[in-house]
Structures are given as structure tokens and as C-alpha cells.
């Protein structure tokens, strides 16, 4: 390796850090071939991009839990209605049994 190129990595891989004099910009938002934004590898705070993804996953799970809780509340209402129906049917059956026993 040439001593004047101290700190440079010579490799065939595109993922090598290219020196700034070559026009490379590290950790900045750019765009892909289709013009869509490409986020930086490192956020301003120095945290990796995985941190917001975890937060997003957590938020999605919270939304899913809200939906599950709504469904559970609906099921509780349906179960209560069914219990009331069963109680009413049991009363009718008991009344019929008492009428049959009297006769």
C-alpha cells in the first residue's frame, strides 16, 4: 500500500468509504436511481436506523393491541347478551317444569 494513501481502503467493493475529495458524501440523505430518498446510515444523534424501525414496530403493535382490545370488548358484550339469553331460557324452562309438576 502506498504510504501517501494513508487511511484509504483499496477494495473492489462498492461499500468502501470513498474519500471526500472524490465527491463522496457519507451519512447524508441522497436519492436512488429512481429519485426516491435514501436515508443516511447514521442518524443525526448517531443512532443506527434500526432504532426508529423498532419504535415503528412498537407503535404498530400498539395499534394492533387497540384493535384487539376493541374486538375483546365486542366479544364481552356478546357473551353478556348470550348469558342474559341463557338465563331467560332457564327461567322459562323452570316455569314450564313448575307448571308440569302442578298438573
UniProtKB/Swiss-Prot annotation:
HAMAP family: ADV_CAP9
Any one cellular-component term (Gene Ontology): viral capsid, decoration
Chief site of localization: virion
Family indicated by similarity: Belongs to the adenoviridae hexon-interlacing protein family.
Subcellular locations according to the entry: Virion; Host nucleus
Pfam families referenced in this protein's UniProt entry, alphabetically: Adeno_PIX (PF03955)
TM region(s), chain numbering: none
GO BP of this protein: symbiont entry into host cell
Recorded domain comment: Three N-terminal domains of hexon-interlacing protein form triskelions between hexon capsomers.
Induction details: Expressed in the intermediate phase of the viral replicative cycle.
Record-level Gene Ontology MF annotations: hexon binding
Keywords: Capsid decoration protein, Capsid protein, Coiled coil, Host nucleus, Host-virus interaction, Virion, Virus entry into host cell
Keyword Metal-binding: no
Name assigned to this protein: Hexon-interlacing protein
Subunit structure: Homotrimer. Interacts with hexon protein; this interaction tethers the hexons together. Self-interacts with adjacent proteins. Interacts with kinesin light chain KLC1; this interaction leads to capsid disruption at the nuclear pore complex during virus entry into host cell.
Chain coiled-coil ranges: 72-99
Task performed by this protein: Structural component of the virion that acts as a cement protein on the capsid exterior and forms triskelion structures consisting of three molecules that stabilize three hexon trimers at the center of each icosahedral facet and fixes the peripentonal hexons. Dispensable for assembly. During virus entry, recruits the anterograde motor kinesin-1 to the capsid docked at the nuclear pore complex thereby subjecting the docked capsid to a pulling force.
Keyword check for Coiled coil: yes
Further information: This protein is only encoded by mastadenoviruses, and may therefore play a role in mammals tropism.
Amino acid at each position: 500500500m502506498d504510504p501517501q494513501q494513508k487511511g484509504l481502503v483499496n477494495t473492489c467493493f462498492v461499500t468502501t468509504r470513498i474519500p471526500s475529495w472524490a465527491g463522496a458524501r457519507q451519512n447524508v440523505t441522497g436519492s436512488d436511481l429512481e429519485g426516491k430518498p435514501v436515508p443516511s446510515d447514521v442518524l443525526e444523534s448517531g443512532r443506527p436506523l434500526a432504532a426508529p424501525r423498532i419504535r415503528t414496530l412498537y407503535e404498530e403493535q400498539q395499534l394492533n393491541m387497540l384493535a384487539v382490545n376493541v374486538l375483546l370488548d365486542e366479544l364481552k358484550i356478546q357473551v353478556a347478551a348470550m348469558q342474559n339469553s341463557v338465563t331467560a331460557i332457564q327461567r322459562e324452562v323452570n316455569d314450564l317444569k313448575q307448571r308440569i309438576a302442578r298438573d
